[in-house]
Curated annotation (Swiss-Prot):
This is Alanine racemase. The lineage of its organism: Bacteria, Bacillati, Bacillota, Bacilli, Lactobacillales. Transmembrane segments: none annotated. The keyword Isomerase applies. InterPro entries: Ala_racemase, Ala_racemase/Decarboxylase_C, Ala_racemase_C, Ala_racemase_N, Ala_racemase_pyridoxalP-BS, PLP-binding_barrel. The modification N6-(pyridoxal phosphate)lysine is found at K40.
Amino acid sequence: MKTSPHRNTSAIVDLKAIRNNIEKFKKHINPNAEIWPAVKADAYGHGSIEVSKAVSDLVGGFCVSNLDEAIELRNHLVTKPILVLSGIVPEDVDIAAALNISLTAPSLEWLKLVVQEEAELSDLKIHIGVDSGMGRIGIRDVEEANQMIELADKYAINFEGIFTHFATADMADETKFKNQQARFNKIMAGLSRQPKFIHSTNTAAALWHKEQVQAIERLGISMYGLNPSGKTLELPFEIEPALSLVSELTHIKKIAAGETVGYGATYETSEETWIGTVPIGYADGWTRQMQGFKVLVDGKFCEIVGRVCMDQMMIKLDKSYPLGTKVTLIGRDKANEITTTDVADWRGTINYEVLCLLSDRIKRIYK
């Protein structure tokens, strides 16, 4: 989807806020650990290239989801180490090796396919993934891990790291977290040899389980200023949201009592009402569930009325406003604020999803 630069709907990204959030984490975590920010999914909607360049001097490397995301960073002259967190097809490992991109090795079966595909593997770096209870990818016992290490050594593959991912580090009940931690530690204790990087700390673990000593801290959602638990757990220090979402009024009208607004005629006015149209819709990631939610106009809350359309939505105004008046969907306007977590709670989802659904059609403005 193409960005729409001629439409005044924008995600404003504060790169200084992201840098400040990283600096606060550096004071909170093990001082010997490297921070490797997660810039996957276009840096959670903030812009992976711009974010990576803005924070490169503060971090040891970057984490992405797939090989294409890593290649994009390399193509834009991001030179720090990059780790692909998901498995890739074995026939593409030569691309990763040539670009100095580290790969997740999710299983012995995958590694066997890699050595069958490629004759020269000395430039390949792998991090063995451990499934300690997430149930996604990774090995589940030390025997498989040691077989992978042996196979890597045989073909001169660089066994650079090993890691796991916690499923419940952002929850008050620590039972599952401690079970995963114990499983991972047991596998680490049984390895035939230790790699350069052992890492299990995601954002939530870095915030609420900082007793872990890790070589890498994989920093995600809180780098962008959001609480990974939503509102469940209190943050140990303040962070600043880096993204605000704004648009404008493109049409304003007064309609009579008894008129309807939007597809399905789901909203009917009970009195004469000022209605404003805003150029954002579900094609931009502002989903249909947002009907009934509020936005800010001149610092005042205004209800979204009628169904959110593909490209536009309508809001109930307290009075007439000039065309071009700013509408804040996420962010602060005067004394009031709408957070990404507020939007997530309304939708019954998580703040991560709200950010990641903001489509490329919304232009990003960096400050």
